[in-house]
Amino acid sequence: MKKWNIYKATREIKEKYISEIVQGCTFFCDDVFEELIKSCDTLEEAREVLKKYKTDITYYSGNTEDCYLITEYCILPEIYDEDGEIVESGDIVEITEMKISVEDEEWNVVKTFDNLKEADDLVHNDERELTLVY
């Protein structure tokens, strides 16, 4: 039986690896925590469920190094046997969008990015007082 599963994946990425923070960076890595959120009978149902979630990026300072905690959601088709065990997984169909905005002093969006490195570079190389929003 085929199901369309919604997964939540969370990964911690050290600030020095900021260029790794792109859409899909949390899936299929060794240092990732994945959680099944919901199992759907159709792709359309799964897409409706996925709309309720969004990618989250949280910056925090650790004891030794600053990090980002990235959480993403995806739709993954999987086939189950008669015992309810997954016997085959397909390719990811859809992932929540990574949308990182850079705003000026008056909260106007200057530019929107799909990765953190380019957004961070703009903030640090522009003369204006810019802020990252994710």
What are these regions (language model features)?
Residues M1-Q23:
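Short, extreme N-terminal segment that most often corresponds to the first beta-strand
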Residues T10, E34-I37, L43, R47-I100, ...:
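Short, mixed-charge low-complexity intrinsically disordered segments
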Residues Y17-D31, T96-E97:
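Intrinsic disorder/low-complexity segments
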